[in-house]
């Protein structure tokens, strides 16, 4: 700005000419009348345009002074020169206002900035440069005071919140006009080196804070954290691939079972079981137990049943517990309790075979519990097991775990007989014959014609008499585990093979 004022000061006297330099304003007396200064050479003024009236106007005190000087200047100065001076001055003022607006609105557009960098705006750097004199008045009036805190833009960004919190309190960051002017006039002079030192110190402080916020070990921890999800993803893909291969081998085994190639089927089951697939492990146990595609080995079958049972396979849990409980000579108490616990897990999961086995098991020592026996028999009968329905009729007829009710027993026998249960039909014929002979004969001989539920009668259930349905997602060998006509040899044909093959359509899926 001081350069602009200097240029104007040197240009205007040259434009006005030597005739205007001697003109000075008339002093005004106390009574309001104007007096002519003796140093003002009015005789040098001449107006060509005024004509004869020029002498009259020069002698009129109201027309003398600055008014005559203005008319004389406007007559001798070119209008283009005045227009250029006004235009350049206006552009300079607009440029300063524009820079000031950029100074205040740039932090709002860029978002919140740290306090130590809030004054590093374009206007601040522009006025701090070497182009401007360090002691200029424009620099003092535009740049903030060094002892004044940096203005915060939170009040501009959230005016409503500030007004709600302090509706009557005046703004503390914006001083009044008089205090601002007095403070700017008393602003101490600073050298350009001070600004450079201030910038360097603030840059160093920001770099130190950044170094504290990101220690050397933090980058390694972030790299490790990014590497962990990648390793987990790779592991998941590998596990999925292994599972897909195991499912494929198990499916090929079931297809070979349908074609009668038990050796190839057992080989595929073994490959899938080696990859930890529970359904294939269960199928290997079935082949080992019944000698299909491999010599019969009950101990190995129990081992594979146990491997599948640990993974939660309900049929494997049932077969493993059943094999243990059917060999009580070498079974210890902890193993017996473990077998019963696995049976309960399978029965609670809805497996009908486990429910029927527990219903009979709880009618015998050392697991005698008549109420629980009736409970599990009722569950198995509700799931469509005709043998459990027949056993439930025996409990009602004898009063085992339930109140004795011959009518309810006959109803259970009829339901089991309608489902094709032959023992229920025989019991109904016996009851009808005794009833025809007389009530007294029923009381003496009726209860001696049958015995309570036993594991021997349960073997009929396991031999396939009830035809229990199997879910297609179990991946088992269908009725192979319930066929009583399967031999130990893996090459001998059997009459029951066609029905067995028809039951293998749902294998290996899920």
Swiss-Prot record:
* Region (Disordered), start-end ranges: 19-61, 142-185
Q: Where are the transmembrane segments?
A: none
Q: Does the keyword Iron apply?
A: no
Q: Where is this site: Cleavage?
A: 141-142
Q: Where is the transit peptide?
A: 1-23
**Biased composition regions of type Polar residues, renumbered to the chain:** 169-181
Q: InterPro entries from the entry?
A: ISR_Activator (IPR052748), Sel1-like (IPR006597), TPR-like_helical_dom_sf (IPR011990)
Low complexity compositional bias: what residue ranges?
A: 35-45
Reply yes or no: does the keyword Transit peptide apply.
Answer: yes
Domain of life the protein comes from: Eukaryota
- What Gene Ontology molecular function terms does this protein carry? protein serine/threonine kinase activator activity
List where the motif SIFI-degron lies.
Answer: 307-326
A single GO cellular-component term on record: mitochondrion
Question: Which controlled-vocabulary keywords does the entry list?
Answer: Apoptosis, Cytoplasm, DNA damage, Membrane, Mitochondrion, Mitochondrion inner membrane, Mitochondrion outer membrane, Repeat, TPR repeat, Transit peptide, Ubl conjugation
Fetch the Pfam families from UniProt.
Sel1
- Positions annotated as TPR repeat: 213-245, 246-278, 279-313, 314-351, 352-385, 386-423, 471-499
Q: Which PANTHER family does the annotation name?
A: DAP3-BINDING CELL DEATH ENHANCER 1
Q: Give the protein family.
A: Belongs to the DELE1 family.
Domain-level remarks: The TPR repeats bind to and activate EIF2AK1/HRI.
What is its biological role?
Protein kinase activator that acts as a key activator of the integrated stress response (ISR) following various stresses, such as iron deficiency, mitochondrial stress or mitochondrial DNA breaks. Detects impaired protein import and processing in mitochondria, activating the ISR. May also required for the induction of death receptor-mediated apoptosis through the regulation of caspase activation.
Q: How does it assemble?
A: Interacts with DAP3.
**UniProt protein name:** DAP3-binding cell death enhancer 1
**What species does this protein belong to?**
Mus musculus (Mouse)
Q: Which gene encodes it?
A: Dele1
């Amino acid at each position: 700005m001081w350069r602009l004022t200097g240029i104007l000061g040197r240009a205007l006297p040259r434009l006005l000419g030597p005739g205007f330099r001697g003109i000075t304003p008339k002093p005004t007396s106390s009574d309001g009348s104007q007096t002519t200064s003796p140093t003002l050479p009015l005789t040098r003024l001449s107006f060509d345009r005024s004509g004869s009236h020029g002498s009259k106007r020069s002698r009129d005190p109201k027309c003398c002074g600055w008014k005559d000087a203005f008319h004389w200047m406007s007559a001798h100065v070119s209008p283009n020169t005045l227009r250029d001076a006004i235009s350049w001055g206006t552009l300079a003022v607009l440029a300063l206002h524009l820079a000031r607006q950029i100074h205040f609105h740039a932090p709002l557009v860029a978002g919140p900035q740290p306090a130590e960098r809030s004054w590093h705006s374009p206007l601040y750097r522009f006025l701090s440069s070497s182009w401007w004199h360090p002691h200029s008045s424009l620099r003092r009036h535009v740049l903030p005071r060094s002892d004044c805190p940096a203005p915060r833009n939170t009040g501009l960004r959230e005016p409503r919140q500030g007004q709600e919190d302090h509706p009557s309190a005046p703004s503390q960051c914006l001083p009044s006009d008089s205090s601002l002017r007095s403070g700017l006039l008393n602003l101490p002079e600073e050298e350009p080196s001070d600004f450079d030192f201030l910038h360097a110190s603030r840059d160093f402080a920001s770099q130190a804070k950044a170094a504290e916020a990101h220690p050397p070990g933090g980058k390694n921890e972030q790299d490790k954290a990014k590497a962990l999800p990648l390793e987990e993803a790779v592991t998941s893909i590998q596990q999925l691939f292994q599972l897909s291969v195991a499912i494929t081998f198990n499916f090929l085994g079931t297809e070979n079972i349908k074609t009668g190639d038990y050796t190839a089927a057992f080989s595929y089951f073994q490959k899938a079981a080696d990859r930890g697939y529970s359904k294939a492990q269960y199928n290997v146990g079935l082949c080992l137990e019944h000698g299909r595609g491999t010599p019969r080995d009950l101990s190995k079958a129990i081992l594979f049943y146990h491997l599948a049972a640990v993974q939660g396979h309900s049929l494997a849990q049932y077969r493993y517990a059943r094999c243990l409980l059917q060999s009580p000579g070498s079974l210890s108490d902890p193993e017996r309790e473990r077998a019963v616990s696995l049976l309960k897990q399978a029965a609670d999961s809805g497996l009908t075979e486990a429910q029927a086995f527990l219903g009979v098991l709880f009618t015998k020592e050392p697991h005698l519990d008549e109420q629980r026996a009736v409970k599990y028999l009722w569950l198995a009968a509700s799931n469509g097991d005709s043998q459990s329905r027949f056993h439930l009729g025996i409990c009602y007829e004898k009063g085992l775990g339930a109140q004795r009710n011959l009518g309810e027993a006959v109803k259970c026998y009829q339901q089991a007989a309608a489902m094709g249960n032959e023992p229920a039909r025989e019991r109904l014929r016996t009851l009808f014959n005794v009833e025809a002979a007389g009530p007294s004969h029923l009381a003496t001989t009726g209860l001696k014609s049958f015995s309570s539920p036993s594991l021997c009668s349960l073997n009929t259930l396991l031999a396939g008499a009830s035809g229990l349905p199997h879910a297609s997602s179990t991946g088992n060998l269908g009725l192979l585990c319930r066929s009583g006509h399967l031999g130990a040899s893996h090459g001998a044909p059997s009459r029951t093979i066609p029905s067995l093959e028809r039951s293998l359509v749902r294998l290996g899926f899920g």
